[in-house]
């Protein structure tokens, strides 16, 4: 049998499917998620149910978002899970997660994310950070390193700044390729994202911060002077105490927010 087939389902490359099969890893992830009935539990990409089953057994209801119609059909027919699941068939990148919030309950979101959509999905989920209590995701290890990077690191970039603006980022565990079927060609890791109730560095307009980061990191080897010359003047850099000769990966989240707020103040 092909190593792309697991429990009778053939993994689809276009959906980035790699199914988690290591029981020890599954138990550790479920322990980190800490499922409970005081939150709306939401799984993105339940796949064949490796995380779905143990989480659903611990709560009254589990909401899942799955794109693959065949996997949705399997979940509808599952002898145990079918009565515990609320299933949304569709693309998580387009999904409005705010519709899942109920009074007095924030979301706990988790999933073994398809690696081909993990970064855009992170940016999409940040839009709902105020409705989310925790997020736990299996990601490509490289992405977890980017999420948790410090200024000056090669991995530090636009994703780092936006993730750390919205959330506290906590790497949980590393997962080797043989824990999946089919085995991915890269190492994986689980990360915990804890959205801030009060952001350490509030931004007056997060869209300005997004645009600033996109522009700054568009050419990583260039200096801030080159990349941001159309967004901030020499005098504004001096007022902020930021050295224009630095490269974008040398600038802290706090400094990016300060630059964005300077732009907002000028536009006001």
UniProtKB/Swiss-Prot annotation:
What domain of life does the UniProt record list for this protein's source? Bacteria
State the coiled-coil residue ranges. none
Cellular component terms per the entry's GO annotation: cytosol
Q: Which reaction does it catalyse?
A: adenosine(1518)/adenosine(1519) in 16S rRNA + 4 S-adenosyl-L-methionine = N(6)-dimethyladenosine(1518)/N(6)-dimethyladenosine(1519) in 16S rRNA + 4 S-adenosyl-L-homocysteine + 4 H(+)
- Per the UniProt entry, the Enzyme Commission number(s) are 2.1.1.182
Top EC class, one word: transferase
Provide the binding site for S-adenosyl-L-methionine.
Answer: 18, 20, 45, 66, 91, 112
Sorted UniProt keywords: Cytoplasm, Methyltransferase, RNA-binding, rRNA processing, S-adenosyl-L-methionine, Transferase
InterPro entries in the record: KsgA/Erm, rRNA_Ade_diMease-like_C, rRNA_Ade_Mease_Trfase_CS, rRNA_Ade_methylase_Trfase_N, rRNA_adenine_dimethylase, SAM-dependent_MTases_sf
First-listed, main subcellular location of the protein, grouped into a coarse class: cytoplasm
The entry's function note states:
Specifically dimethylates two adjacent adenosines (A1518 and A1519) in the loop of a conserved hairpin near the 3'-end of 16S rRNA in the 30S particle. May play a critical role in biogenesis of 30S subunits.
As for family, the record states: Belongs to the class I-like SAM-binding methyltransferase superfamily. rRNA adenine N(6)-methyltransferase family. RsmA subfamily.
Matches recorded under PANTHER family: DIMETHYLADENOSINE TRANSFERASE, DIMETHYLADENOSINE TRANSFERASE-RELATED
Q: Mind telling me what this protein is named?
A: Ribosomal RNA small subunit methyltransferase A
Source organism (scientific name): Shewanella sp. (strain W3-18-1)
Q: What is the lineage of its organism?
A: Bacteria, Pseudomonadati, Pseudomonadota, Gammaproteobacteria, Alteromonadales
Q: Which gene encodes it?
A: rsmA
